[in-house]
Amino acid sequence: MDGTVIRSAALASLLIAAPMVAEAHQLVVFASVDCEAVTVEAKFSNGNPVQQADVRVLDGQNALLVTLPIETDGTVTVPLDSVDHSEGLLIEVDTGSHDNYWIVTPDDIARNCQS
């Protein structure tokens, strides 16, 4: 093969592989709530849990309430009695190179606390 064919094949391979690499690094954040706590889960789009990240919990006015390290299984639990959740919560997960967030509304908390 001549150099042009080799370069064309290499470029085609790069164009095919590049979107897969970018997709593998998307950060997915989910939070569920019950009457006692918010459970935060963070993983990459390939399903691997985030193993190192800071989880910031902010109130409805965007004031920082607490920062917690994520567990190696990609989760962290925030006890509701440790934060002012009257106006909802903004949960931010930051791995250092990727970040994303989840909003927990007052209605989410109230709905899950009904007996």
Predicted segments — roles?
Residues 1-10:
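Bacterial N-terminal signal peptides that target proteins for export
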Residues 17-19:
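N-terminal signal peptide c-region/cleavage motif recognized by signal peptidases
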Residues 46-51, 84:
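A short beta-turn/strand-edge loop motif at beta-sheet boundaries
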Residues 53-57:
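Hydrophobic beta-strand segments
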Residues 85-98:
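Short, aromatic- and glycine-rich surface loops/edge beta-strands on solvent-exposed regions
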